[in-house]
Amino acid sequence: MSPLLVASRNRKKLAELRRVLDAAGVTGLTLVSLDDVAPFEEAPETGAVFEENALAKARDAFAATGLASVADDSGLEVAALNGMPGVLSARWSGRHGDDAANTALLLAQLRDVPDERRAASFVSACALVSASGEVVVRGEWPGRIAREPRGDGGFGYDPVFVPDDAAGRTAAQLSPAEKDAVSHRGRALRLLVPALETLARARG
């Protein structure tokens, strides 16, 4: 089994990639996270687009550890906010990773926006960097922003994001399997599967 570093400390992201690999029948890779390797200096997320941030994180992880590395950068693009929060999604309220504060600010900004103008998309860019080269893919998940949070699954803006393909439920009301099948990150990770299969075969 060859190690594949997921350049994140978010265990939910690690579990999501593991489910995608299992569903695709990809074997021969052992997933490890940043918590499983020696600490290294991580570059700040300064890219203007998701792809830049994902690639920078994967490059840093590969350079520091020598392990094939996968990284993602994802966020929410809201039409009424001209595509924001975008790459600032995780720190929209000024506090990085404060899901409740970020969501509360988003809902406040959209308070007077009518339902027909609350369109939004989750976007995920995933990058794989290994000795064989670099691959970058992108997945999108269209929907709209609800008026109040619903559901207790997922993370981030999931409780206020109503996907177009979820029969009125928020992303936080979907099971992990349902979310994997249609989510932005699930779509991006599935696009990465052929490269991961090649990586597994090369090391098998």
UniProtKB/Swiss-Prot annotation:
Its EC number is 3.6.1.66. GO terms for cellular component: cytosol. The keyword Hydrolase applies. InterPro entries: dITP/XTP_pyrophosphatase (IPR020922), ITPase-like_fam (IPR029001), RdgB/HAM1 (IPR002637). The keyword Metal-binding applies. Coiled coil: none annotated. Keywords: Hydrolase, Magnesium, Metal-binding, Nucleotide metabolism, Nucleotide-binding. Its cofactor is Mg(2+). The active site is at 73 (proton acceptor). One of its GO terms (molecular function) is dITP diphosphatase activity. It comes from the Bacteria. Mg(2+) binds at residue 73. Homodimer. This is dITP/XTP pyrophosphatase. It comes from Mycolicibacterium paratuberculosis (strain ATCC BAA-968 / K-10) (Mycobacterium paratuberculosis).
